[in-house]
């Protein structure tokens, strides 16, 4: 893999999650452009720089020896990547503080470097939260590959930060620089809420939660076919989002024990709040993690999963395949994985490579619900 070479450092970076023979690199031309632009400003060593949405730590790891840098974002995998890439390049793994998107920053920043996220609601929430954290003369510099840079990103910077200057294109990347100007205080439109009729629930969704404005059609197809009569089974909701699958299942399985896990900190925050609203003080484990990687082998009886098919702008079934492998490791012999998936993804044949038996529980014109038994 090529090294990231900038005026700040030469770094050997890897992506997360680890994939054998991964053809994708852990940085792009937008990272390079952003670092070149910042270096040209010759910031003092005591300058405070906040880095947002740094997918694999390329920005923060480049800056760690040159300014006081803090990284923040909504991805547990990005946090893991930052720590691994710092250590991989001879730095202390914890030398850059990381603030999850569900928590708040401390102090003021002279520069904020933003990788424009796929979900613009996350960008909007982050820009609103920056109010009160920008030092006089601060700049917010957003970077993206042009094909992933919507006009709305510049409009949000203008609305919440100040006048925006777009750069020339460089290697198909562009920067948007906003000079801090006092704006009237803005209240956040997040979290959003929506109601379900069956089961009767009101669900809260923080800014980066998938389908935050309404139930996604895959989950809608899945809900009527969730397993019943589970007794005191140990159940995991893998990639839980706002927690709707686990919560709906828990309502009909009062003795079962639930673990909800997602790599999005905002999803975990939403799931925790939704569980409490629906089920009060009933015991539950809700955590941000790399799927079931940290779960003890053969410790679960049931896994529920509506697997994702993209990681930021990268589309594919590699995350789903990894989740299926993790579920197999975590399930007891005889345990079952229940999933929903688009018909065209061919999950039945993939599951058959890992599990003893795979059956179709239900189907719609677009989705299949499958049960895979270990």
Swiss-Prot record:
| GO MF annotations in UniProt | 23S rRNA (guanine(1835)-N(2))-methyltransferase activity; nucleic acid binding
Q: List its EC numbers.
A: 2.1.1.174
Q: Which UniProt keywords apply?
A: Cytoplasm, Methyltransferase, rRNA processing, S-adenosyl-L-methionine, Transferase
> Has UniProt tagged this entry with the keyword Transmembrane helix?
no
Q: Which Pfam families match?
A: MTS
Family in the record:
Belongs to the methyltransferase superfamily. RlmG family.
Q: Which HAMAP family match?
A: 23SrRNA_methyltr_G
User: What is this protein's name?
Assistant: Ribosomal RNA large subunit methyltransferase G
- Gene source species: Pseudomonas putida (strain W619)
